[in-house]
């Protein structure tokens, strides 16, 4: 390929990435983004006005003030009207932006806890997210279900290094710090699947520390949460039952599954693994093929993964273990085809 064409391809590549992951800070899907977006548009509008004014002034000076042989260019020193204008206009613009910013900061106030908020505890790990619904005790990882129209209050910390929790389509990012609790709240105005990302460099797989937020109507969320509370792992097929035995022998020391003796806390809770659309914290699609590859060689698929490889598992054991993990579904899980943006 001609190297001179590479710069021309950059916008196409970036555009393709945007279309795939639909991460957009200008999305008006939450009150936070709406307020901040309006402020950014106001600042952009003033920037355009100033730019147009500067271009006009430069052209005016070039055309009207150019020097001819023997001419004395017109002088503007002592022009009180011009000097007052050059001081008053920037002062007015800066003042408007200042007070608009103060008003926006007061409106969003996303660190305080609303009275009717759903409280979710968030813990960042290298390289995945742990979520606990505080009132119900339901625990999940990497993919979070929330109700629309109701504030969700996040109490966040980290188990190892500093991470940063950010779902751009819903609002502001906040660091998760070991030994500290940081807080914020967000509200999704409409149903959808919103993509998030760790935005604090945290190790080799920082870019692979992703998450998804599934926003559904309140009634649908309540039904899902009730089903998640009542969930007990009960594999039906013979393959899934054999896979449960493999899981207990190979995985239970690090992972937990609700309603079983597996209560590990080192890795993600896998109680609802069959519901998740991805594995590896948003990196790979949740299909049997990728699941078996992940189990066989997690560090090879995600650099820095603390999950050991299991090359000694037979193909039959991998198939059974995958069948068991895919069977772990709660009742009333939202149909993502209906809520996907």
Residue ranges and their predicted role:
Residues 142-144, 171-175, 185:
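Beta-strand-rich interaction surfaces with strong enrichment in secreted/lumenal proteins
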Residues 2-148, 341:
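Extracytoplasmic entry segments of secretory-pathway proteins
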Residues 90, 122, 154-156, 198, ...:
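Conserved hydrophobic/aromatic pocket- or pore-lining residues that grip, position, or stack substrates
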Residues 115, 137-140, 219-248, 332-341:
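Electrostatic cytochrome c docking/interface patches
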Residues 125-127, 149-151, 157-161, 170-172, ...:
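Solvent-exposed coil/turn segments that connect beta secondary-structure elements
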Residues 96, 176-229, 235-237, 249-252, ...:
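Extracellular/periplasmic metallocenter environments
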Residues 115-117, 139-141, 147-151, 160-162, ...:
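Extracytoplasmic
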Residues 229-238, 245-248, 261-328:
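Extracytoplasmic electron-transfer domains, predominantly the class I c-type cytochrome c fold
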């Amino acid at each position: 390929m001609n190297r001179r064409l590479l710069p021309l391809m950059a916008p196409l590549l970036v555009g393709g990435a945007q279309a795939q992951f639909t991460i957009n800070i200008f999305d008006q899907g939450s009150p936070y983004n709406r307020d901040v977006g309006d402020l950014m548009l106001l600042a952009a509008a003033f920037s355009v006005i100033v730019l147009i004014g500067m271009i006009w002034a430069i052209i005016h000076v070039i055309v009207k003030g150019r020097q001819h042989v023997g001419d004395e260019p017109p002088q503007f020193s002592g022009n009180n009207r011009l000097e007052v204008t050059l001081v008053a206009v920037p002062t007015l613009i800066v003042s408007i932006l200042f007070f608009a910013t103060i008003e926006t900061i007061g409106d969003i106030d996303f660190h305080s806890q609303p009275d009717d908020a759903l409280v979710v505890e968030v813990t960042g790990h290298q390289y995945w997210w742990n979520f606990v619904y505080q009132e119900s005790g339901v625990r999940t990882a990497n993919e979070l279900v929330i109700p629309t129209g109701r504030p969700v209050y996040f109490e966040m910390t980290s188990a190892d290094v500093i991470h940063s929790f950010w779902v751009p389509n819903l609002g502001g990012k906040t660091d998760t710090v070991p030994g500290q609790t940081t807080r914020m709240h967000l509200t999704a105005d409409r149903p959808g699947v919103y993509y998030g990302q760790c935005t604090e460099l945290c190790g080799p797989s920082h870019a692979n520390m992703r998450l998804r937020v599934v926003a559904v109507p309140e009634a649908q969320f309540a039904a899902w949460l009730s089903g998640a509370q009542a969930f007990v792992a009960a594999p039906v097929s013979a393959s899934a039952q054999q896979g449960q035995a493999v899981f207990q022998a190979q995985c239970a020391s690090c992972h937990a599954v609700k309603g079983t003796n597996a209560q590990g806390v080192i890795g993600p809770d896998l109680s609802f693994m069959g519901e998740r659309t991805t594995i590896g914290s948003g990196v790979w699609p949740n299909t049997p093929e990728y699941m078996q590859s992940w189990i066989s060689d997690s560090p090879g698929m995600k650099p820095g993964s603390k999950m050991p490889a299991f090359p000694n598992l037979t193909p039959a054991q991998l198939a059974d273990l995958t069948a068991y993990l895919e069977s772990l579904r709660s009742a009333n899980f939202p149909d993502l085809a209906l809520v996907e943006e």
